[in-house]
Amino acid sequence: MSKKYDAGVKEYRDTYWTPDYVPLDTDLLACFKCTGQEGVPKEEVAAAVAAESSTGTWSTVWSELLTDLDFYKGRCYRIEDVPGDKESFYAFIAYPLDLFEEGSITNVLTSLVGNVFGFKALRHLRLEDIRFPIAFIKCCAGPPNGIAVERDRMNKYGRPLLGCTIKPKLGLSGKNYGRVVYECLRGGLDFTKDDENINSQPFQRWQNRFEFVAEAIKLAEQETGERKGHYLNVTANTPEEMYERAEFAKELNQPIIMHDFITGGFTANTGLSKWCRKNGMLLHIHRAMHAVIDRHPKHGIHFRVLAKCLRLSGGDQLHTGTVVGKLEGDRQTTLGYIDQLRESFVPEDRSRGNFFDQDWGSMPGVFAVASGGIHVWHMPALVAIFGDDSVLQFGGGTHGHPWGSAAGAAANRVALEACVKARNAGREIEKESRDILMEAGKHSPELAIALETWKEIKFEFDTVDKLDVQ
């Protein structure tokens, strides 16, 4: 028996720290931000992460002789300092693709973050980024439809889509809920949506809501001549109930359903995405609970990882924050998410938080959704940041209009079309935002009132989770 298989305990770095290793194109690469306990060498901390997230255990075991450990083990091949942080460092780890079940995001996350975060040798650990090899991506179904198909289904081109969450999000009866949906859609929105925590409560059972929403959509389409939709939340207590709700939405001829992908889980989400593809249904994804996982700058999973995983698991729209609204997220970081959702190839760019080149092959893109504390004054910045392949959702910024939800929807539609027209004419819409909106307000009393109502409303808080750049 060779020395390395002698019984006992040995340091992780003897096996899992391999600074001379050159990653293969087929390797899954991960970047962890590590903060070790005082006195533990960086190489030992990084190697421990590589070991526990792949083949390692705390003791040398005889059964290692029954496999090729050198082939299957994760390898920490590089360590970098974190700019501006003397306590933490980046550990870059390569995993052979055979460690993971083909196309299973659940299995990837179970391996990479399932147990290692509880290590005593670590004070903090954060998964910053993953490079999925194209061989793994080809095993994932991805978005059930994608951006181009969704535009064709909804017959909407050349601009961002407009939506809003129904407010109050809890407490309305099914009939009154449908009434609010109708007001928003007839006013000019493309979509309305259930909020993340609307499922099937005593005040509003899901069948009742679905039926009244379907009626509201039909009336709004007849009145406006436009295709409309509402994100019907099918998230449920069991997969069987989830599919029952999805099937009922299909029976009502609805174009889109919704899922809370983190609370619902990646297994449920992947299954629902495949159902949507088979049944011609669009799938909106809410990220409820994400900040519990991604907001701490030293511990958890960065949202760019969750966004990548969602694109692979499947969804046609995903919330990404707004930059300018009430939710966390700076501009460069958010642009990094948007790139990962929509582009076919995303180069390494630390200024946007992307640690690796990411080739998405021919996988369809996902609409980026801006939602949370936005109103008409934000419209120029939103159009500039998110571009056309996005959904801009104004909840309070629609329903809070003094003349009601229909007027709020009309104000948002006029503001959007004014910004798109100005952009297409070559104007710098962020610099000229006030002039563009005030000019449009002269021809729209709904917009003029909205501009006056929201003129003092700002959310100027510093970002907690900032990019680690010099």
Curated annotation (Swiss-Prot):
GO biological process: photorespiration; reductive pentose-phosphate cycle
Active site residues according to the UniProt entry: 167 (proton acceptor), 286 (proton acceptor)
Listed cofactors: Mg(2+)
GO CC terms of this entry: carboxysome
Binding site for substrate: 115, 165, 169, 287, 319, 371
The enzyme's E.C. designation: 4.1.1.39
Gene name linked to the record: cbbL
Modification N6-carboxylysine, positions: 193
Protein name: Ribulose bisphosphate carboxylase large chain
Cofactor note: Binds 1 Mg(2+) ion per subunit.
